[in-house]
Amino acid sequence: MSVKSYAVILLTGALSACQQTPAPVKASLGEGWQLVWQDEFSQNDLDLTKWQHEVNCRGGGNDELQCYTARSENSFVKDGLLHIVARQEQYTGPLHNSDEVSSDAEREKQATQPFTSARLRTKNLADWRYGRFEIRAKLPAGQGAWPAIWMLPTDWRYGRWASSGEIDIMEAVNLKTLTDDKTAPAGSLETRVHGTLHYGGPAPKNVYSGSPYRFSEANNPADNFHVYALEWQQDEIRWYVDDVHYATFRHDQWYSTSQQQDGSFIENTGFAPFDQRFHLLLNFAVGGNWPANVNDKGVDFAGYPKQMLVDYVRVFQCSKNSETGIGCATKQPSAVQIKGKTYPQ
């Protein structure tokens, strides 16, 4: 969710909007995955032993236009689905999450935004190092709509963003607007979702790498439910849509640096930063630096309220080696190998 812009990495044999494009090959689920956590949203209310709301109006660090609230108008469970609802309404609330600041003066700061929405997280309720994460969801459409399923470090061991990393399982912006995908036929609508890692040093020394997945227009992710998944092991991270393994990122393509008290930087060794506990986040942002600068540009205020629907969230760990997560991989040879950034010497 901290993306400012995307360098598009083309998929080998990627999907196009043409109906004659062969169906992508699904990968058989690797053996050894053991279900360790789930929310099927089968209760009448959001399970607050599993999820907590973020409450702030700071715009996500991306100039987004929403206040995140804990109100039932913005998030609720009904008919077996989690509803995350963005509404166009002027709203004033706290600038920061209460756990992000240390002084009363900072906690009392407020801001006003033209939209409300919700951002849910499992921080300190459920955190994981390595595993398979599956989320079945239907996404909102429109210029400025930015749904995301992602992960942040719980302990920030290597320092502030992005020294400690960020894992984006799925993001989409501006679905069903006119696409600016240069590989799509003229006049096509936006269908892409994106998987991304953020790493490197503390902003502005952060970097990111990722890959898009292109749906056919007949199967737009704003019209249908799809399963978005990520497999994370010690030396590799893999992305999936509906069991299609579409991208892989190897550990020799990422790095992490931490800033010292004297201002110098050191490179963190091993598999940093993706060797620590992370937690899940689900949210629906409106506007921001990424969606407002692509497709039709700006934010379309029409059509609200809009919602992101989540059918289930399931987390698996590799029973063959829970310490490294290695041994249960679901792989497809045609998946693109993401090229990362190297540590600047």
Each predicted region: which residue ranges?
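Bacterial N-terminal signal peptides that target proteins for export
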Residues: 1-7
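GH16 jelly-roll
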Residues: 19-345
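Hydrophobic h-region of N-terminal signal peptides that target proteins for export
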Residues: 12-19
